């Protein structure tokens, strides 16, 4: 019988607004149980510092030139993670065996073989007196992969544990949207890749025009009118990028210049349809669904709450492909990524594979993450 471990997963996405924290129990294989989830918002100083730093980092040289600021912010980020880890462990009333610490991505460029997350695993281990796994992406990149996406094996676990009929597809709409196609229980049969922008362009447009961080439920975009001319040109331009066969994206791969002259609401509406079409096209291209074969798309991530975006995707799909949100299966769609890194931490500690050729383009199934015990 496999041993079960209690693991805390800490994940901060491209929105840079806070940390999702999840405690789970799992054997690192086909069994898992969610125990406790909570979101912790960054304070205003950390949030603004992260946004400012990300704006400065566009190359490896920029990482070197801003090393002092990066190191200072890394310490603040780690102290914040230590504080919230102690809080969630206390709230959950459980002892944790291991912590999966993703850190905050400030630069990701698969072509240049780099994915930089800030977060000091050694310091976190010392502060928590816990084993910590961090630096999840480096080994995948070292072995020829793109370092992302890493959640597919957890998506596979969710599909199988909830007895969802296969083939099924998990569509995660975070800052970047990614897809996992599950056709069997075998992790090596998984197919996964980044689609393109998820919430990132929408959120950036909102931040530039308002004091808000996102368009709640897509309400503002519903007030606007999409510019079809601008939309079609933007889709053509994106197709040229995607034809380079990139499996992973960074938000720096996209910009808002094509909607610059539009009103706030019209810009949002155009961006919603742009994002929806990219997702729709990727579903059709990658899945090769047979004309009369039903295929379920299960949506997770913050984008599932944007009703305007969801409707824009749904109305374009053929009748044999249909959408459901993961919450319909009594799984909290806000914490899939943090639960995934709790699960990956267990697998990493057990020296189990976390990425595969069809998920990250890595040359061979690869382990990942660095395990530290600094106490």
Curated annotation (Swiss-Prot):
Protein's pathway: Amino-sugar metabolism; 1,6-anhydro-N-acetylmuramate degradation; Cell wall biogenesis; peptidoglycan recycling
Alphabetic keyword roster: ATP-binding, Carbohydrate metabolism, Kinase, Nucleotide-binding, Transferase
Source organism (scientific name): Pelagibacter ubique (strain HTCC1062)
Gene behind the chain: anmK
A GO molecular-function annotation: kinase activity
InterPro entries assigned to the protein according to its UniProt record, in alphabetical order: Anhydro_N_Ac-Mur_kinase (IPR005338), ATPase_NBD (IPR043129)
GO BP term, pick one: 1,6-anhydro-N-acetyl-beta-muramic acid catabolic process
Record: residues binding ATP: 13-20
Family: Belongs to the anhydro-N-acetylmuramic acid kinase family.
Pfam family, any one: AnmK
Name of the protein in its database record: Anhydro-N-acetylmuramic acid kinase
Catalytic activity as recorded in UniProt: 1,6-anhydro-N-acetyl-beta-muramate + ATP + H2O = N-acetyl-D-muramate 6-phosphate + ADP + H(+)
Name of the top EC class for this enzyme: transferase
Coiled coil: none
Free-text function comment from the UniProt entry: Catalyzes the specific phosphorylation of 1,6-anhydro-N-acetylmuramic acid (anhMurNAc) with the simultaneous cleavage of the 1,6-anhydro ring, generating MurNAc-6-P. Is required for the utilization of anhMurNAc either imported from the medium or derived from its own cell wall murein, and thus plays a role in cell wall recycling.
Enzyme Commission no: 2.7.1.170
UniProt-listed PANTHER family: ANHYDRO-N-ACETYLMURAMIC ACID KINASE (PTHR30605:SF0)
């Amino acid at each position: 019988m496999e041993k079960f471990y209690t693991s805390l997963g800490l994940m901060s996405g491209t929105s840079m607004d806070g940390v999702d924290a999840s405690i789970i129990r799992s054997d690192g294989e086909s069994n898992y149980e969610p125990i406790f989830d909570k979101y912790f918002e960054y304070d205003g100083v950390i949030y603004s510092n992260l946004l400012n730093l990300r704006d400065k980092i566009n190359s490896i040289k920029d990482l070197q030139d801003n090393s002092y600021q990066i190191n200072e912010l890394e310490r603040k980020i780690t102290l914040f993670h230590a504080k919230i880890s102690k809080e969630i462990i206390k709230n959950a009333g459980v002892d944790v065996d291991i912590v999966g610490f993703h850190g905050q991505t400030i630069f990701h460029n698969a072509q240049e073989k780099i994915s930089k997350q800030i977060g000091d695993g050694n310091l976190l281990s010392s502060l928590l007196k816990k084993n910590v796994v961090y630096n999840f992406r480096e080994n995948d990149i070292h072995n020829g992969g793109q370092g992302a996406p890493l959640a597919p094996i957890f998506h596979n676990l969710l599909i199988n544990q909830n007895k969802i009929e296969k083939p099924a597809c998990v569509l995660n709409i975070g800052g970047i949207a990614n897809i996992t196609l599950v056709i069997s229980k075998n992790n090596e049969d998984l197919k996964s890749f980044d689609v393109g922008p998820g919430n990132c362009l929408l959120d950036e447009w909102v931040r530039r025009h308002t004091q808000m961080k996102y368009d709640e439920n897509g309400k503002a975009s519903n007030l606007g009118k999409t510019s079809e001319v601008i939309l079609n040109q933007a889709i053509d331009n994106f197709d040229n990028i995607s034809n380079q066969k990139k499996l992973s994206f960074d938000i720096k791969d996209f910009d808002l210049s094509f909607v610059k002259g539009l009103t706030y609401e019209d810009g949002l509406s155009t961006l919603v349809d742009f994002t929806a079409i990219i997702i729709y096209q990727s579903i059709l291209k990658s899945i090769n669904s047979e004309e009369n074969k039903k295929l379920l798309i299960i949506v997770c991530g913050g984008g599932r709450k944007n009703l305007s975006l969801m409707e824009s995707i749904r109305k374009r799909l053929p009748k044999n492909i249909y959408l459901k949100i993961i919450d319909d299966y009594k799984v909290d769609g806000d914490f899939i990524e943090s639960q995934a890194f709790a699960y990956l931490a267990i697998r990493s500690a057990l020296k189990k594979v976390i990425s595969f050729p069809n998920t990250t383009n890595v040359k061979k199934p690869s382990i990942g993450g660095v395990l530290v015990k600094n106490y």
